[in-house]
Amino acid sequence: IPYILTPAAPASPKINGAKIFGVRPGSPFLFKIPATGKKPLHYYVENLPEGLQVDKTSGIITGKIKTKGEYKMTFIVKNGVGTDKRVFTVQCGNLLALTPPMGWNSWNCWGLSINDERLKASAQAMISKGLIDHGWMYMNIDDGWEAEQREANGKIVSNKKFPNLKKTGDWLHNKGLKFGIYSSPGPQTCGGFLGSYHHEAQDARSYADWGVD
């Protein structure tokens, strides 16, 4: 019989996750303040950098920072039981992935049978099980999303399992989650789908257009 030894999170707010985040100047910023505690929680940020805004009910911070630099701010999370605070640093420059990425990858669960519905169900589980409140944020689509052939202009497209990856990315971002995708440097992926060989820059532009993080 499965059992859980991890103690339940307290009713009072507790801010979790990394204390630093990297982003490039002018790039889209997305970060959900990870916090546990009895719902509803209310989120506030002191010294929020210009160009960013925080949703006080979801804790999702979005926007763009134009200028390079180190930005220190204070996260504040409140509920009817208490308050928690934490100093948080954003490094705006060329340094990304300043902490180990935390998230989910489709391969071990779904292999080549991953599709849009299964991805979204897994994302909902990330939220409903509280992983997002502990700093888990990436939803990564592994192999099996690619169409059988490119468009006439060489652009890579998704197959029928993912009708619109741009909309999928937008859906994930609205939940405060980040969008990851699999690619291969060879002509084909391990699963026999399209690789990025001789289309590396073109595919990278497509991923950016879809909102891949």
Regions found by a protein language model. Give the residues of each.
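An acidic-aromatic substrate-binding cleft motif
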Residues: Q91-R118
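Aromatic-lined carbohydrate-binding/catalytic grooves of carbohydrate-active enzymes
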Residues: N108-W110, S122-D213
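Proline/serine/threonine-rich low-complexity linkers at boundaries of modular beta-sandwich domains
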Residues: I1-P13
